[in-house]
Protein backbone atom coordinates (compact mmCIF):
# COMPACT_ATOMS: atom_id res chain seq x y z
CA UNK A 1 0.00 0.00 0.00
CA UNK A 2 1.51 3.30 -1.11
CA UNK A 3 0.79 6.14 1.29
CA UNK A 4 1.41 9.84 1.26
CA UNK A 5 0.76 12.74 3.65
CA UNK A 6 -0.08 16.23 2.50
CA UNK A 7 1.01 18.84 4.96
CA UNK A 8 -0.21 22.37 4.58
CA UNK A 9 1.61 25.18 6.38
CA UNK A 10 1.36 28.84 7.30
CA UNK A 11 -2.40 29.44 7.23
CA UNK A 12 -5.17 29.91 7.76
CA UNK A 13 -5.63 32.63 5.16
CA UNK A 14 -9.13 33.60 3.92
CA UNK A 15 -7.98 34.07 0.32
CA UNK A 16 -6.46 30.57 0.14
CA UNK A 17 -7.58 28.12 2.83
CA UNK A 18 -11.20 27.70 1.62
CA UNK A 19 -9.93 26.84 -1.86
CA UNK A 20 -7.55 24.22 -0.43
CA UNK A 21 -10.36 22.73 1.66
CA UNK A 22 -12.68 22.53 -1.35
CA UNK A 23 -10.00 20.79 -3.41
CA UNK A 24 -9.21 18.28 -0.66
CA UNK A 25 -12.91 17.58 -0.16
CA UNK A 26 -13.39 17.03 -3.90
CA UNK A 27 -10.72 14.32 -3.74
CA UNK A 28 -11.84 12.96 -0.35
CA UNK A 29 -8.43 13.71 1.19
CA UNK A 30 -7.65 14.64 4.77
CA UNK A 31 -4.47 16.62 5.38
CA UNK A 32 -2.52 18.00 8.31
CA UNK A 33 -2.51 21.79 8.59
CA UNK A 34 0.35 23.35 10.56
CA UNK A 35 -1.03 26.73 11.50
CA UNK A 36 0.51 29.99 12.62
CA UNK A 37 -1.19 31.19 15.81
CA UNK A 38 -1.36 34.82 14.71
CA UNK A 39 -3.19 33.74 11.54
CA UNK A 40 -5.63 31.68 13.61
CA UNK A 41 -6.37 34.75 15.76
CA UNK A 42 -6.86 36.93 12.65
CA UNK A 43 -8.92 34.34 10.75
CA UNK A 44 -10.88 32.20 13.23
CA UNK A 45 -13.56 31.30 10.68
CA UNK A 46 -11.01 29.69 8.37
CA UNK A 47 -9.50 27.83 11.33
CA UNK A 48 -12.95 26.47 12.25
CA UNK A 49 -13.52 25.43 8.62
CA UNK A 50 -10.37 23.31 8.67
CA UNK A 51 -11.41 21.64 11.92
CA UNK A 52 -15.01 21.11 10.74
CA UNK A 53 -13.75 19.44 7.56
CA UNK A 54 -11.98 16.87 9.74
CA UNK A 55 -8.36 17.78 9.04
CA UNK A 56 -5.62 17.49 11.63
CA UNK A 57 -4.12 20.67 13.10
CA UNK A 58 -0.54 21.23 14.20
CA UNK A 59 1.38 24.03 15.92
CA UNK A 60 3.61 26.16 13.66
CA UNK A 61 4.50 28.78 16.33
CA UNK A 62 2.53 31.95 16.95
CA UNK A 63 4.61 34.27 14.75
CA UNK A 64 6.29 31.86 12.28
CA UNK A 65 9.69 32.41 13.88
CA UNK A 66 13.01 30.67 13.21
CA UNK A 67 14.37 28.88 16.25
CA UNK A 68 17.98 29.87 15.62
CA UNK A 69 17.05 33.55 15.84
CA UNK A 70 15.43 33.36 19.29
CA UNK A 71 16.44 32.39 22.79
CA UNK A 72 15.07 29.09 24.05
CA UNK A 73 12.59 30.72 26.46
CA UNK A 74 11.28 33.10 23.78
CA UNK A 75 10.92 30.34 21.17
CA UNK A 76 9.19 27.98 23.58
CA UNK A 77 6.84 30.74 24.77
CA UNK A 78 5.93 31.48 21.15
CA UNK A 79 5.06 27.81 20.56
CA UNK A 80 3.13 27.53 23.83
CA UNK A 81 1.06 30.59 22.93
CA UNK A 82 -0.46 28.56 20.09
CA UNK A 83 -1.38 25.79 22.53
CA UNK A 84 -3.77 28.19 24.22
CA UNK A 85 -5.76 28.14 20.97
CA UNK A 86 -5.45 24.70 19.36
CA UNK A 87 -4.18 22.13 21.91
CA UNK A 88 -2.35 19.98 19.35
CA UNK A 89 0.28 17.34 19.99
CA UNK A 90 1.96 18.08 16.62
CA UNK A 91 4.64 20.71 16.07
CA UNK A 92 6.56 21.78 12.99
CA UNK A 93 9.29 24.38 13.29
CA UNK A 94 9.02 27.16 10.69
CA UNK A 95 11.62 26.71 7.97
CA UNK A 96 12.67 23.50 9.74
CA UNK A 97 14.90 25.58 12.01
CA UNK A 98 15.27 25.13 15.73
CA UNK A 99 18.15 24.64 18.08
CA UNK A 100 18.95 21.39 19.83
CA UNK A 101 17.74 22.64 23.21
CA UNK A 102 14.51 23.81 21.63
CA UNK A 103 14.05 20.41 20.02
CA UNK A 104 14.96 18.61 23.22
CA UNK A 105 12.35 20.54 25.22
CA UNK A 106 9.60 20.48 22.60
CA UNK A 107 9.85 16.74 21.98
CA UNK A 108 8.42 16.10 25.44
CA UNK A 109 5.28 18.05 24.57
CA UNK A 110 4.84 17.36 20.86
CA UNK A 111 5.42 14.95 18.05
CA UNK A 112 7.82 17.01 15.96
CA UNK A 113 7.02 16.66 12.29
CA UNK A 114 9.40 17.54 9.49
CA UNK A 115 9.04 16.62 5.82
CA UNK A 116 10.91 14.97 3.03
CA UNK A 117 9.45 16.93 0.12
CA UNK A 118 8.96 20.66 0.26
CA UNK A 119 7.38 21.76 -2.99
CA UNK A 120 8.76 25.31 -2.82
CA UNK A 121 5.37 26.57 -3.94
CA UNK A 122 6.05 29.82 -2.06
CA UNK A 123 9.11 30.71 -4.17
CA UNK A 124 8.98 33.49 -6.75
CA UNK A 125 11.82 31.70 -8.53
CA UNK A 126 9.72 28.59 -9.15
CA UNK A 127 7.29 28.30 -12.03
CA UNK A 128 4.13 26.28 -11.39
CA UNK A 129 5.38 23.45 -13.62
CA UNK A 130 8.58 23.21 -11.56
CA UNK A 131 6.58 22.87 -8.33
CA UNK A 132 4.60 20.01 -9.87
CA UNK A 133 7.79 18.40 -11.16
CA UNK A 134 9.24 18.47 -7.63
CA UNK A 135 6.33 16.29 -6.54
CA UNK A 136 6.59 13.97 -9.54
CA UNK A 137 10.33 13.57 -9.16
CA UNK A 138 10.74 13.25 -5.39
CA UNK A 139 7.52 11.75 -3.96
CA UNK A 140 8.09 8.33 -2.40
CA UNK A 141 6.04 5.89 -0.36
CA UNK A 142 5.55 7.49 3.05
CA UNK A 143 6.48 10.99 1.88
CA UNK A 144 5.33 14.03 3.79
CA UNK A 145 4.72 16.65 1.11
CA UNK A 146 4.58 20.31 2.10
CA UNK A 147 2.36 22.84 0.39
CA UNK A 148 1.55 26.26 1.83
CA UNK A 149 -1.83 27.95 2.17
CA UNK A 150 -0.17 31.33 2.03
CA UNK A 151 -0.44 34.43 -0.09
CA UNK A 152 3.07 33.81 -1.43
CA UNK A 153 2.02 30.44 -2.85
CA UNK A 154 -1.28 31.82 -4.06
CA UNK A 155 -0.15 35.08 -5.64
CA UNK A 156 2.50 33.41 -7.78
CA UNK A 157 -0.02 30.82 -9.06
CA UNK A 158 2.05 27.87 -7.90
CA UNK A 159 -0.47 26.45 -5.45
CA UNK A 160 -3.46 26.58 -7.81
CA UNK A 161 -1.49 24.85 -10.53
CA UNK A 162 0.55 22.31 -8.61
CA UNK A 163 -1.68 21.07 -5.79
CA UNK A 164 -4.56 19.71 -7.90
CA UNK A 165 -2.20 18.22 -10.47
CA UNK A 166 -0.04 16.69 -7.73
CA UNK A 167 -3.08 15.03 -6.20
CA UNK A 168 -4.17 13.67 -9.59
CA UNK A 169 -0.65 12.42 -10.34
CA UNK A 170 -0.24 10.72 -6.97
CA UNK A 171 -3.65 9.07 -7.17
CA UNK A 172 -2.82 7.78 -10.67
CA UNK A 173 0.41 6.35 -9.21
CA UNK A 174 -1.66 4.42 -6.67
CA UNK A 175 -1.03 6.50 -3.57
CA UNK A 176 -3.51 6.84 -0.73
CA UNK A 177 -3.48 9.90 1.48
CA UNK A 178 -3.38 9.85 5.26
CA UNK A 179 -3.04 12.38 8.05
CA UNK A 180 -0.14 12.49 10.47
Residue ranges of model-derived segments:
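Catalytic domains of cell-wall/extracellular-matrix polysaccharide-remodeling enzymes
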Residues: 41, 52, 63-180
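Active-site-adjacent substrate/metal-binding segments within catalytic domains
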Residues: 7-12
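Short, small-residue-biased leader/transition segments that mark boundaries at the very start
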Residues: 2-6
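Short, well-structured secondary-structure segments
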Residues: 16-41, 48-51, 56-61, 113, ...
